[in-house]
Amino acid sequence: MIVLTEQIEIPASYEKSKAWTANFEEEFVKWSPYHIECNLYNGNYNAGSKIRFREIVMGLDYDVTGTITECEQDENHFRIVFRSDKKTAFITFEGKRTKTGCHFSHTEAFGMTTPVIGAIMNFLIFKVFFRKKANWQLIRDDMILDNRYLYDILTEGKYPERIPLDKLLTGAK
């Protein structure tokens, strides 16, 4: 299994990050110019809810549906875990209150965890069938950029400039 984690300290109140999370369906698309769709099919992001993300990064079209498997929230912490329908991708967003604002962590994990067969399947998935989409550096760079955008959103209320959809879709695979 491949696990990528990017974290950032944001000098904005935890309440701002929690409000951003509470409006996730709308905020996901505004978060990055590469994010083009987010559908909360149940209207919320509670555990068991169905969700769909779509983003196009460097011409690669990532269109993923799945289920929220964990959703914890209190006055000092939130954690939301998404599992793809194919059960080969997990995305975790976690926020914590700090003395200077909030800490945000974004983790994306890919692959099967089943002993022996998991390693074989991961090789086939990542090295044979989906080699272009399994570009770990591209995914990590996108996560870093997402964190930078979130920093600007929560500290300055500044959203990134949108890229026209037709431009994003040109050559998307």
Model-assigned labels for residue ranges:
Residues 5-7, 63-65, 90-92, 107:
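Well-ordered beta-strand positions in beta-sheet-rich domains
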